[in-house]
């Protein structure tokens, strides 16, 4: 009896990155993130084949977007709303991130979610229950939602713990931190 064994293909893991949360969280933690090294880390540590980065679109930041794409991120843009009342520009991506996590659910083995936002606790609980969560990486331990920590359980990781692997340097307290390339405008693409 001839039995043909089909070669099992292992699905890649996918990363879903809340860019504003990552940028501001790293900055507040005193870290200057190296996006190229961060993308390599995601690939080597978590077998991330596709890394979706959700970001507000501002035409002035085209160079930044090109750099991020060259570093291996797949950009998912959200229009940025610029209020007339002096508030910072805003490009809310939370719903887009959660939707994409579920949209691509059958394509990936496990998800890596990069955020500190408690709004993701429901999707993180669900992924954990279904054994589809590789990790939640919080950009800032001090600002990480307690709900997110509870939902992620033992799969919680903090950007500060990756110092030297994914950050160029640790900014000194009070030191002016240089904005990412193309992010010198009043509003940031990460807003």
What are these regions (language model features)?
Residues 1-191:
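Terminal and domain-boundary accessory regions
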């Amino acid at each position: 009896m001839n039995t043909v064994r089909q070669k099992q293909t292992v699905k890649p893991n996918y990363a879903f990155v809340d860019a504003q949360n990552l940028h501001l969280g790293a900055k507040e933690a005193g870290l200057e993130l190296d996006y190229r090294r961060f993308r390599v880390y995601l690939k080597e540590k978590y077998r991330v084949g596709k890394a979706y980065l959700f970001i507000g679109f501002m035409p002035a930041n085209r160079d930044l977007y090109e750099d991020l794409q060259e570093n291996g991120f797949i950009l998912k843009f959200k229009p940025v709303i610029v209020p007339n009342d002096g508030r910072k520009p805003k490009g809310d991506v939370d719903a887009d991130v959660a939707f994409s996590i579920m949209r691509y659910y059958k394509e990936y083995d496990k998800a890596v979610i990069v955020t500190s936002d408690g709004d993701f606790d429901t999707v993180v609980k669900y992924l954990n229950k279904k054994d589809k969560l590789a990790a939640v990486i919080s950009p800032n331990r001090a600002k990480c939602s307690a709900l997110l920590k509870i939902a992620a359980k033992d799969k919680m990781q903090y950007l500060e713990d990756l110092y030297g692997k994914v950050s160029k340097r640790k900014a000194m307290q009070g030191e002016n931190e240089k904005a990412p390339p193309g992010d010198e405008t009043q509003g940031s693409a990460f807003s």
